[in-house]
Amino acid sequence: QEKKSVLLDNVKYDASDSIIIDQKQNKIILYNNAKIEYDDIVLTSGLIILDYKENIVTAGRISDINGELSQYPTFTQGGNVVNPDSIKYNFDNQKALIWNSKSEENGMNILSSLTKKQNDSVYYLKDGKVTTGGNLMGDESEEADYFFKIRKGKLVPGGNIITGFTNLFVKNVPTPIGLPFAYFPSQQTRDSGFIIPNINESNQR
């Protein structure tokens, strides 16, 4: 009971169409231009559902008058901004599941089909793309000049990305370049581009 009251006493919420408080389900449902603020967290979305018993918030898109999905979630914590299709966040342990997210870290554009937020500084990526060569769309019409396609990776915001198996794509076309792992350093002190491991370089010289 105490934990529940702490969340409700400190969270700010608003929506332009409806705010439904379901006391039986212990939920607050916000629809259309929904927004919540809690500590250093700001979440906006078409639909937000706050479970104040479990201290979990979920957010997703809504359909417009033409049946098109709109009002994608925007999750901001500190200086980190993520734009996913949907998100589920736990206020107690600060962990989150984030679907189809787009974000930017020090000049690197990052797209991930599933992201697990471990805490406010560590994210685990699955089936993602990383580039400094343009905007990532996530479909067949990629605008980026090139990108690295990753299966799994670890992101430290403001820092580095370490990945497992990685493929290089140029103009959305796969190249023969495949690496068992790759290291993408922070771009804060670099002009552009990546450093990737040169496998067996010493043996080739």
Please report, for each region that a protein language model flagged, where it lies by residue.
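Structural signature for solvent-exposed beta-strand/loop edge elements and short helix-capping sites
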Residues: Q1-R205
